[in-house]
């Protein structure tokens, strides 16, 4: 992503996770190009303003209220016309397809306290409630975008 997007700032993640990320970035020779933002996205300020925020594989580890609050929080730190891109594993409305996501949903139910897979409609509802007037499904069952 850094090679394709020169203006990319860098990841916001927990300090423990960023240690691994920093090592990988250094191995790729990109340490001069990236700024690490350390914190807990549910509790700490996100900084900003930003033109775009990518939330990757976050929703399925949280409860619906936490997801709705996080989407609202991201909306507040976006520039006008800013984009929130959510990459996750979305179930179809029948909650049994696509097959890989349905299997992953069972894995989350068995192995986590709060984890589950959501539908695209649920994610879209969080985006709408946060104030995103434009919502697009970018890739079926995995990527949705809200434009401020």
Would you name each region that the model predicts?
Residues 2-148:
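Alpha-helical subdomain
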